[in-house]
Amino acid sequence: MTKLPYALLDKGSLLVASPDINGGIFSRSVVLVCEHSPNGSFGLILNKILEIDSPEEIFPLDHFDESKVRFCMGGPLQANQIMLLHTSPDSANSSIEICPSVFLGGDFSFAGEKEGRTRDDKMLLCFGYSGWQGGQLEKEFLERLWFLAPSSQEIIFTDAPERMWSDVLQHLGGRFASLSTIPENLLLN
């Protein structure tokens, strides 16, 4: 995996928090950029997992392998809004492809539909989202608060989201690989 130059920031890129962001929801976060334009940016944090039970009446997930469904904190904005990231191309007419084989959106009813669904489909239910005003993310890059990395279905739906931050930095190599070993609590160093 190679680091993407800042100029390549676009839908489908990963924002990887610099160790300089310490504390708060963005500390050691990996954000999937879902939209980026001069007017602003919108993304979903992928590695802040929420341990909650899903009420069957709200989330009809009976046709999904439970190990393939995760709940996460998508960001600090509108935490009562749920964003759906998934790998089901069958719902592509009501979804937007963010990167190859990863879709955003769709009606929750598609999750309960058995037809066309495979038990290999993966889903992230993200509570809230992350947003930046026009120029804000660019300013944060200049302050070296974020690194840019390419995304893939494998990274987004990893079986080890708690290691996503260090794994992505490790794959970027070079100085990024050494940053991946910095302990969360520097007093433990």
Curated annotation (Swiss-Prot):
User: What residue intervals traverse the membrane?
Assistant: none
- Which family would the database say this protein is a member of? Belongs to the UPF0301 (AlgH) family.
For this record, the Gene Ontology CC terms, alphabetical, are: cytosol
Please report the name of this protein according to its UniProt entry. Answer: UPF0301 protein CT_211
User: What single Pfam family name could you report for this chain, choosing any that match?
Assistant: DUF179
SUPFAM superfamilies recorded: VC0467-like
